[in-house]
Amino acid sequence: MRRIAVMGAAGRMGKTLIEAVQQTPGAGLTAAIDRPDSSLVGADAGELAALGRIGVLLSDDLAKVADEFDVLIDFTHPSVTLKNLAFCRKHGKAMIIGTTGFTVEEKQLLAEAGKDIPIVFAANFSVGVNLSLKLLDMAARVLGDDVDIEIIEAHHRHKVDAPSGTALRMGEVVANALGRDLQEVAVYGREGQTGARDRKTIGFATVRAGDVVGDHTVLFAAEGERLEITHKASSRMTFAKGAVRAALWLDGREPGLYDMQDVLELR
């Protein structure tokens, strides 16, 4: 059995991850961690996820459960994830990282840690989203510079980073396929007298409202026709199942920084 720990286990995504782990053959939740000031520390992780008691109590410190897991799943905050990354690197633990909002410099720290431990880092662990990335690469290469490209994403009102990590990853895939640098061509929102659109740019539009789990559309607009590639998530479980799938895939892997394209063999 693959021994899995979940960081941020008392949160919405954490509870969904606990459920996904317990539903997956070959995986087992052996540790659950949340922030030290959580009033739920000491509670049974299974009861937090409405599964009934499973005998795993919520801890407030990763170090206290260091001997109880093989791989840590972390969907928290960059500052928290980086601390956990240092811990896992020191103790030889694999990691699944679904945290978004990293800076370029922070992503480099993930790559450095990948020299010592196996890591799967992805902006989105949904199988559908990762298939969409493959389709986006194909579409961009075929359509080339003859289209205007816009990325529209929507998430729930509690999401703190924008654009979403998935939207940015979609932009990177499209830009790379076209030989462009996303940092140079990205346009984040428009207002006022913007002038005519530069064909080389890739636009981003962000919506934050209600309980939207995650909607992403990439628009390729040409003269006379439009191609839209859209993915809509209706449940966090799709991300959680992908993360657990990645955790099982990492078993026996050499150190390295992998992503879901590797897990799904889409390269």
Curated annotation (Swiss-Prot):
UniProt EC number: 1.17.1.8
SUPFAM superfamilies per the UniProt record, alphabetical: Glyceraldehyde-3-phosphate dehydrogenase-like, C-terminal domain, NAD(P)-binding Rossmann-fold domains
This protein's UniProt keywords: Amino-acid biosynthesis, Cytoplasm, Diaminopimelate biosynthesis, Lysine biosynthesis, NAD, NADP, Oxidoreductase
GO cellular component, as recorded: cytosol
One Gene Ontology term from the biological process aspect of the record: diaminopimelate biosynthetic process
Enzyme class: oxidoreductase
MF GO annotations: 4-hydroxy-tetrahydrodipicolinate reductase; NAD binding; NADP binding; oxidoreductase activity, acting on CH or CH2 groups, NAD or NADP as acceptor
Principal subcellular localization: cytoplasm
Catalytic activity: (S)-2,3,4,5-tetrahydrodipicolinate + NAD(+) + H2O = (2S,4S)-4-hydroxy-2,3,4,5-tetrahydrodipicolinate + NADH + H(+); (S)-2,3,4,5-tetrahydrodipicolinate + NADP(+) + H2O = (2S,4S)-4-hydroxy-2,3,4,5-tetrahydrodipicolinate + NADPH + H(+)
Compartment(s) where it occurs, according to its Swiss-Prot or TrEMBL record: Cytoplasm
UniProt pathway: Amino-acid biosynthesis; L-lysine biosynthesis via DAP pathway; (S)-tetrahydrodipicolinate from L-aspartate: step 4/4
Keyword Repressor: no
Family from the record: Belongs to the DapB family.
Function description: Catalyzes the conversion of 4-hydroxy-tetrahydrodipicolinate (HTPA) to tetrahydrodipicolinate.
Name of this chain's protein: 4-hydroxy-tetrahydrodipicolinate reductase
Name of the gene this protein is made from: dapB
